[in-house]
Amino acid sequence: MEVVTLFELYELEERLRARGFCHDTREGAPICRWLVERVTVDVMPTEATVLGMASEWFHEAVTTAARMDLGDGLKAPVIKRPHFLATKLTAYRDRGAKDPYMSKDLEDIVTLFDGCQETGFLLEDGSSSLKNFITSGMQVHLENPEFVEAVEGCFRSDPVSRERSRIVLERMRAIATARS
């Protein structure tokens, strides 16, 4: 479901509450996060005027989302990985780049790269403009020594974690130099 207006967001929130969802009120939780049992759902409007957050990729992410079967006849739209990365790169650019060491968006980007064996999937299923945005964004960020240092800072200082950090940066560089 695409939410464009504040009224539509309120309607969706009422529907979520009726199904047992509640806002995640834990410290550090984003304002868009909802919980039910062990399921976590982030509900993001596609228009910036609704929650004051925007990404030029939200609309495309919603319209190209895959449907995931959650069982019991319940299906949920899940945005594709390239769109998730693009929305996180946008969020990092708009709010996290000012202080990369404290950026939750950078942590999410690092987690995405840390959790993949191959980087190609981060560019699959995306338009050329999306792929160009991702590759150029990664190029710009990797040129910033504070970004690289903050990525390294997302890991512990033991040898295994240092190696993970090196692998993540290597994967980021592979995306930055990929051609669509």
Which ranges hold each PLM region?
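Compositionally biased terminal segments of proteins
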Residues: 1-180
